[in-house]
Amino acid sequence: MDSLPRNSPPRNSPPLNAPGQSPVAATLPLAAADRRGEWWKRRSALVAAAVFFVAMAWPFLRRGENSEFVVCYLRAARRLQAREIIHRDEPTAYAYPPAMAMLAMPLAQLPDETALVVWYLVNVVATSVVVAGAWRLLGGPPLTRLQGRWVAVFWLGVLLAFRFASAPLENQQFDVVIAALLVAGCLCLRRGRDLGGAVWLGAAAAMKCTPLLFAPYLAWRGRFKSACVLALVAMVLNRLPDFFWPQAGGLSYLGDWCGTFLAKVGRSAPGVWDSDLVLNQSLSGLVNRFAQSGLPGSAGPLPSGLAALSPETVAWIRCWTYGTSVALLALTAWRFGRPGQPWRAAGADARGDRDAGSSQIGLEAAALACLMLLLSPMSSKAHYVVLVLPCIAFARAYIERRDAWLRILLPVLLLTGPLTSKGLTGKALGDLTLAWGFPTWFALGLLLAVWRLLPAKQTETTAAGPLAGRVGRAA
């Protein structure tokens, strides 16, 4: 005799769902839809990256031979190859250390349009390294398999960082490459390869001085040899052009840069650089604009770096700029803990990795990224790509924690970060937000958040790893 499972309906009873449809068949479309939704969630980072790079190709390539990369960097590289002076006081001047021109020299051998396409591909790789490396530093799972709360963390990080991640691609600058070198160096530190990390960080410092902040940071953590290697790499890369392409008369490219541009920092009021003062979103630019006009109520006329300032005003700007800079450095050092302490172990991250000090290195690097922008003599929005790291740190903490301070900071960050895009606000209001220093306040807000996220005190877990921490607690 055939038997039916207990509590099952009779064979001849009408179906419980639609006519002619079994219960299993009714759930198949829902299951398929759930699988498709889960697939999109897991692959959302890859889809976002593909859309971003396709969308940014046109703004990057549209100016062709008139782009900033060609007019500034390739021109400097070709002058270097011809053993000419590369640091000149001219429109679209090359105002960076000579190492950047040397590294652009291979592309200077190509036609301008071809070099620009290759440079975009380099920036695509560098942007991928920045995002994936920062995500890894802060303990995120593989970006190809996002699920659960990590989907929300990723998209909140994208919302906060998108404006500043796209800015260097709009201007064809080196900032994404510098940020990639910084992230690569921090990843080496995370894995215990201190000297390798110092080499990557030194290469970044060779192209822009602000990454030199990592040298005293390494010394603070007791890595004196790594700090020396970082400074040595930065110096050697900037001296190589003098050996391979010496100028007639024995002049030094590095000396030319110091005399032409770096010396202006000492002669002028803080915030004055070879660009519009409104574009300078460093701390010195904010103080300089405030000293001239306070908070302007309209888009014009805006404060200018060419304004004749009285000696008293210049002294006031220097006092506030340098005093605030020292205060930010002191507070950051206090949050880092006592000098000489090793990195604390963070246990396993979302990948199952148990590298020592992973989250602490990521958070401390995020704080240094904010300081790099705030303490620099000149920081434009293109330089702000390094804030990808603190943006991800904030996004993860906001999603995972019930922290009232982070809840208060989020609308402030949204107002001063993503909403500064002139595509959203228009040129007049966009210029006004720059005059108010919205990006500067954005970096300050992120620095406050990172200070709050850093551990309050040294734990028993040391750089030897989680096992040592467990042994210490057992003892």
Question: What is each residue range found by the language model?
Answer:
Residues P111, A126, K208-P211, P390:
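Hydrophobic transmembrane alpha-helices
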Residues M1-N7, N12-M56, T144-A152, L446-A475:
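Start-transfer (signal-anchor) and selected internal transmembrane alpha helices
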Residues A393-R470, A474-A475:
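Aromatic-enriched
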Residues T27-L195, R221-D349, D353-A365, C370-K381:
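Primarily membrane-embedded glycan-assembly and transfer machineries that use lipid-linked glycans
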Residues G185, G197, A204, L410-P411:
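Small-residue hotspots
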Residues L195-A219, L368-L375:
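Membrane-interface alpha helices of multi-pass inner-membrane proteins
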